[in-house]
Amino acid sequence: MTDTWWLNPCKAIDAQAYEQALARQQQLTKPAGSLGQLEALAVQLAGLQGQVKPSVDSLWIAIFAGDHGVVAEGVSAFPQEVTGQMLQNFVTGGAAISVLARQLGAQLEVVDLGTVTPSLDLPGVRHLNIGAGTANFVNGPAMTEAQGQLALQAGRDSAWRALANGAQLFIGGEMGIGNTTAASALACALLDCPVSDLTGPGTGLNAQGVSHKVAVIERALALHAGQRGNALQTLFNLGGFEIAALVGAYLGCAQEGIVVLVDGFICTVAALVATRVNPACREWLVFGHRGAEPGHRHVLQRLDAQPLLELGLRLGEGSGAALAVPLLRLACALHGQMATFAEAAVADRPA
C-alpha cells in the first residue's frame, strides 16, 4: 500500500470552544444536568465544530450499496436483485431514507459500489462498478486489496463532497443483501466474540436460518483467522464494498472535521473498523440508535457508545441515524437559545 491516507491525523477537538460551551451550559436557566444527555451532546458538538453554539442544520446523507458473494450460501431471506431495485427506490423517493431526507432538508446521494446487475445506469446514482458484488468469503477474500482501497476512497470522496457542500453533519447508510452476515463476521473477527452472540435474523431469517448463518460465518472466520490482527485486511477479507466505503467516509469526515452520526449494526461495525485503523476518529462519531440486531449492543459497548434512541429498528439505510437528527438539532437549539440566569434575571442557586 503506497498511499495510506487513512492513517492521516484526524482534526483536533477545539478545547476552548468545548470549555466555553460547558461553562455556558452551566449558566442556562435550568438545574445543572437536568437535560441529561442533550447537554453533553451540545457541548460535544461545540468542541467538534469549534463553535460555542453549534449547529447541525446542514445534513449530508450518503447511501452506499453493494452486493455480497456470501449470499450464495443461503444467508439472506431476500434475493440479491433487491439491492439494485432499491437503488431505484432511493433516487425516486420511495425508500424510508428518501422520506426522512426530505423531511430533514438533507442532501441525499446514492453510491453504487458494485452490484450483481452492473449494467445498471440509473439517473441520480453514482455507479462505480468496483465489481459485480464481493466474492464469497467462505472460499477466499471478499475483495482484493485494490478493490478495498477503491471502496475506501469512494467513502472519502463522499466526505469531501459533503465538505464542499457545507455539511455540518454526515450520515452514512448502506444497502446490500447479505451485509448483516458480512458485518457479523467482521465484528466477530475484530472483537473475538462467539459468532452466535453477534449474529441475528438480518432481513428476516427464522431460527434455522440464523443457525445456518452462524455456521457459514464460523467457516469464514476459520479460513481467514491468520489475518485477524490487521483490521484493514480483515475488512477486505470479510467485509463488503459498502462497508469499506462507510469506513472511508468516517475516516474522511474525522480528518476534515465533519461530525458523523452513525446508524445501525452494519454502520457501527464500519465505525469499529475505522477506530481500529485510526483510533482518533472515535471522537467524531456520535451514535444515533441501538437497533434490534443482537450484535449491535455488543459492538456499541466495545466502542463505549451511548446511542440516542432505542426503537427496535433494523432497517439500515441510515434511517435510525436520520431519526436522531431532530434530537441533535433540538440539543443545539436549547444550548444556543435558552437564556442564562443573568440574562433572565433568575437566581442561579436554591434559596
Swiss-Prot record:
Keywords: Cobalamin biosynthesis, Glycosyltransferase, Transferase. InterPro entries: Nict_dMeBzImd_PRibTrfase (IPR003200), Nict_dMeBzImd_PRibTrfase_bact (IPR017846), Nict_dMeBzImd_PRibTrfase_N (IPR023195), Nict_dMeBzImd_PRibTrfase_sf (IPR036087). One of its GO terms (biological process) is cobalamin biosynthetic process. One of its GO terms (molecular function) is nicotinate-nucleotide-dimethylbenzimidazole phosphoribosyltransferase activity. Signal peptide: none annotated. HAMAP family: CobT. Catalyzes the synthesis of alpha-ribazole-5'-phosphate from nicotinate mononucleotide (NAMN) and 5,6-dimethylbenzimidazole (DMB). This is Nicotinate-nucleotide--dimethylbenzimidazole phosphoribosyltransferase. It comes from Pseudomonas fluorescens (strain SBW25). The lineage of its organism: Bacteria, Pseudomonadati, Pseudomonadota, Gammaproteobacteria, Pseudomonadales.
